[in-house]
């Protein structure tokens, strides 16, 4: 079976990546260096695939990230960064259950890792596991109080659990970070409505509509 062009390119990039370092260490000329690089060992290949896969995930190239990170993920020799970015890539490419499992294991392995907790908490909101999302996002919000997305999604989770006063508090903090976000005003209004506080909901509905109309002009 012939290799895909992208596979061949990655191989050539891998060999080129290490060609110069081989030449410097062994005093080879460039022809000899590239010849040596084509016999690159598995450890170097693993490092390259790991770094390249994580880079793909960070850049939003999730399918490419999955292809590379699956080759270096080892459940027995657990690497939190590999598991985190492979988990993100799985979620983004539709393999939500597999991604969530990896993120949960990542948090179990690194319970104080705020980035892992953030990603897992937001994933729980996405899959509507609000009871699991709330404690994680509260912890993350305390560690990173100016993260708009965390504050907003925490409000969404609280609202869906019927904890409307707490949801409004979280939405208002998010609104302080981004005053002109129409979706936050609308979320506050809906939370007020669900408590029967129509007069308090009305100005937020109006503001949301104004912002939406302004954005469409």
Curated annotation (Swiss-Prot):
Disruption phenotype: Takes up less Fe(3+) than wild-type cells, is less responsive to magnetic field, cells have 1-5 magnetosomes (compared to 8-14 in wild-type). Cells have chains of empty vesicles. Magnetosomes are slightly further apart than in wild-type. Deletion of genes mamH to mamV (amb0961 to amb0978) gives cells with no magnetosomes and no magnetic response. PANTHER family: TETRATRICOPEPTIDE REPEAT PROTEIN 6, UDP-N-ACETYLGLUCOSAMINE--PEPTIDE N-ACETYLGLUCOSAMINYLTRANSFERASE SPINDLY-RELATED. Oligomerizes into high molecular weight complexes (at least 560 kDa). Forms round, 20 nm diameter complexes with a central cavity. Interacts with full-length Mms6. Probably binds MamC. Belongs to the magnetosome MamA family. Its main location: membrane. The keyword Phosphoprotein does not apply. TPR repeats lie at residues 12-44, 46-79, 80-113, 114-147, 148-181, 182-215. It is found in: Magnetosome membrane. This is Magnetosome protein MamA. Residues 41-112 are annotated as: N-terminal domain (NTD). Probably forms a large homooligomer on which other magnetosome subunits assemble. Required for formation of functional magnetosomes from pre-existing vesicles, it has a dynamic location in the cell. This bacteria makes up to 20 cubo-octahedral magnetosomes of about 45 nm in diameter which contain membrane-bound crystals of magnetite (Fe(3)O(4)). Expression of just the minimal mamAB gene cluster (amb0961 to amb0978), including this gene, is sufficient to form a minimal magnetosome chain with small magnetite particles. Keywords: Biomineralization, Magnetosome, Membrane, Repeat, TPR repeat. Signal peptide: none annotated. The keyword Cell division does not apply. GO terms for biological process: magnetosome assembly. Induction: Constitutively expressed, levels remain the same over 144 hours of growth (at protein level). Part of the probable 18 gene mamAB operon. Protein missing TPR1 (residues 1-41) forms an N-terminal domain of TPR 2-3 and a C-terminal domain with TPR 4-6 which can move with respect to each other, hinged at D-112. Pfam families: TPR_16, TPR_19, TPR_8. GO terms for cellular component: magnetosome; magnetosome membrane.
